């Protein structure tokens, strides 16, 4: 550890109190760190395992001042933290990953632009401000695409598929997203979806986990399988892109980068998340060091850990009524269960995950 590394007993502030914040707090505790959560919902999943919670809005000035004063470093568990709040914290505290990464990722336009400018290929896309630009974008992209709101869309929300040049359908689609600023992403025939979980420390060192192959259902991640059924060359291209992105952002922490894989093995970046990622939960059961520990290591100024995988695995999200599967899962021989402490199992709500491991093959 260098002189700037956090010593045991230091405090890590975490903005956001969901399951990602919970698992970050648990990882921090293993290193002897205390955690303080800023989250408006009292008794949130992260607060259940943290030392303290500030119950306030993410942009509450008094709460931000309290968090900054109490923390040796501040991180966040989701990408829709108000950038103004992160910038305010950064005036008096160390905020990692840097707020600039938040700002870029919060807007699909700036995200796609940054990826392309960093030499990372994406599906073709066009900016959409109104019906006229949407119709023009459809024409430019061959009459097919996915209309996506620029901000606050996640788990498939704020998206409409378009499959023709019909202007009425285009106008209806724009109305369906409440005429919000958007992009139109060209439709691509992909063979599979994969993601890479990568980390960069304060000195610029990079460590990357094996790629996961992801399956989504209703816009929400259903399973992540490792190893992904891709070539060595495709996997290496994804790792290279992730490393390129980490350096371009001057990033510190863990980042998730998602790709479409075309039939010929070509990779098209879909999006990145400047945080620990749902498709990296498998690392908790199949690696010596999880993505959560890796993130804590990075932001605390500790050396990055070994990302080697000791097992093959399939991570399955438990959503809503899947809570009823828990008794059976507990009887499975090689299933690692993690529940998030949520008080209500609503439809579409992630309440936990299970990772089924088996001996490593490749």
From Swiss-Prot:
Q: Which residues form the ATP-grasp domain?
A: 112-300
- Keyword ATP-binding included in the entry's annotation: yes
Cellular component annotations (GO), alphabetically ordered: cytosol
Its Gene Ontology biological processes?
Answer: 'de novo' IMP biosynthetic process
| Enzyme class, UniProt record, top EC level | ligase
Q: Which GO terms describe its molecular function?
A: 5-(carboxyamino)imidazole ribonucleotide synthase activity; ATP binding; metal ion binding; phosphoribosylaminoimidazole carboxylase activity
Q: What is its EC number?
A: 6.3.4.18
- Describe the reaction catalysed, as an equation: 5-amino-1-(5-phospho-beta-D-ribosyl)imidazole + hydrogencarbonate + ATP = 5-carboxyamino-1-(5-phospho-D-ribosyl)imidazole + ADP + phosphate + 2 H(+)
Binding annotation for ATP: 108, 148, 153-159, 185-188, 193, 216, 270-271
Indicate yes or no for the key word Nucleotide-binding. yes
Which of UniProt's keywords are assigned here?
ATP-binding, Ligase, Nucleotide-binding, Purine biosynthesis
Instruction: State the oligomer form and interacting partners.
Output: Homodimer.
Entry similarity comment: Belongs to the PurK/PurT family.
Q: What does this protein do?
A: Catalyzes the ATP-dependent conversion of 5-aminoimidazole ribonucleotide (AIR) and HCO(3)(-) to N5-carboxyaminoimidazole ribonucleotide (N5-CAIR).
NCBIfam families per record: PRK06019.1-1, PRK06019.1-2, PRK06019.1-5, purK
The protein's name: N5-carboxyaminoimidazole ribonucleotide synthase
Q: Which organism is it from?
A: Brucella melitensis biotype 1 (strain ATCC 23456 / CCUG 17765 / NCTC 10094 / 16M)
């Amino acid at each position: 550890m260098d002189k700037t590394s956090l010593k045991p007993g230091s405090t890590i502030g975490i903005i956001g109190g969901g399951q990602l914040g919970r698992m970050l707090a648990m990882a921090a505790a293993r290193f002897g760190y205390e955690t303080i959560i800023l989250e408006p919902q009292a008794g949130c999943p992260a607060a259940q395992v943290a030392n303290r919670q500030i119950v306030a809005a993410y942009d509450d000035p008094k709460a931000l001042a309290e968090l900054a004063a109490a923390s040796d470093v501040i991180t966040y568990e989701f990408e829709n933290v108000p950038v103004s709040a992160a910038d305010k914290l950064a005036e008096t505290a160390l905020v990692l990953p840097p707020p600039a990464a938040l700002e870029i990722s919060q807007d699909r336009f700036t995200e796609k632009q940054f990826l392309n400018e960093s030499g990372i290929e994406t599906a073709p896309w066009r900016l959409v401000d109104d019906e006229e630009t949407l119709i023009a974008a459809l024409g430019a992209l061959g009459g097919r695409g996915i209309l996506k709101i620029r901000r606050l869309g996640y788990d498939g929300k704020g998206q409409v598929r378009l499959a023709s040049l019909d202007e009425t359908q285009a106008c209806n689609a724009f109305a369906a997203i409440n005429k919000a600023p958007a992009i139109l992403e060209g439709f691509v025939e992909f063979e599979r979806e994969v993601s890479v979980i990568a980390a960069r420390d304060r000195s610029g060192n990079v460590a990357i986990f094996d790629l996961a192959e992801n399956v989504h259902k209703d816009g929400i991640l259903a399973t992540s399988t490792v190893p992904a059924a891709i070539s060595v060359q495709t996997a290496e291209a994804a790792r290279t892109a992730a490393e390129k992105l980490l350096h371009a952002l001057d990033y510190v922490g863990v980042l998730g980068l998602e790709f479409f894989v075309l039939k010929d093995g070509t990779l098209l970046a879909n999006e990145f998340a400047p945080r620990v990622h749902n498709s990296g939960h498998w690392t908790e059961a199949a690696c010596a060091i999880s993505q959560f520990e890796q993130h804590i290591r990075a932001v605390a100024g500790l050396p990055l850990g070994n990302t080697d995988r000791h097992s093959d695995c399939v991570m399955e999200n438990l959503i809503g009524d899947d809570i009823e599967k828990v008794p059976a899962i507990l009887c499975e021989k090689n299933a690692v269960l993690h529940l998030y402490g949520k008080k209500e199992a609503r439809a579409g709500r992630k309440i936990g995950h299970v990772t089924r491991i088996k001996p490593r093959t490749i």
